[in-house]
Amino acid sequence: SRKIRTDKVRKIRQNLFYTGDLNPQGKQTENISRDLSGYWQERGSNNLAGRILTADIDWGNNLIYCASDGGNIWRGSLAGEGWTSLTDYLQIRGIHFLRLIEFDETRRLLIANGDNLYYTDDEGVTLQLSNGLDFLSGWGGNYLKRVIITENKIVYLLASEGTGNWNNVGTIYKSIDHGRIFTKILTLDTNSGMSSNQSSDHYDIWTSRYFDGFIYLLHNDEFYRITDADELEFIANIPVSGTSENILTGGMGSNYPFFYAHVGGQIYQSMNGGSSWIDRGERPQWYFNLQN
């Protein structure tokens, strides 16, 4: 099997290392950012490529930015050349959002995982933590589920936030300065009209990246939009057969936005702006995670 072959190669390499028989010609000096250098040897894998978690493309400059499973941001050309690690000094595990936005002669990369949201205006030389999200470093049940950016570059976050009694509820934060400072606009609890107090696993948000429109909110069998006044406006119920694992995605049709919602293992579709929904059947057996 592949595991047996891999273990065999590892054992051979280890023996060569300890006996001093490892060919020194196999070593080479590598210069990496922060002016660090050293002798590096390939340690594997033998037949497995690395994978990325999410990516964004700068079409104007023919660049692609990728978040690797190892926790780094990489930049290369669209031809697949010149790959450079921009954040080798900090490992950010579980990145689920990466987006380049440009404004006022600034190029800003936004990077998010479940624990933090970072931004850099200098291609990763320095990373800054967004302000207003201190709760993420508190109780372990706090986490950042979703980041979306509107066509006019307003940033919204969906998070799970502790209530102080070992429970958490979904909350939505908003930034009007391109991700530098966030303000809470909604707590998704019974005071906001929700049927119960639940974590962000029972919610998701979506908006069009390329067209001006609303922020849409999925909550189990309920579908809303967020108005310009940061208030919830109910649209319709969804005929779901379960709850939890809420995932919402969509696009812009010729007359209305269309949506696909994943709730409790089933997939639902709306082609008329969320006014009515049909059950499209059970999801595939397994899927990676939100960004896939």
Q: Model segments located where?
A:
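Extracellular glycan-interacting surfaces
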Residues: S1-N292
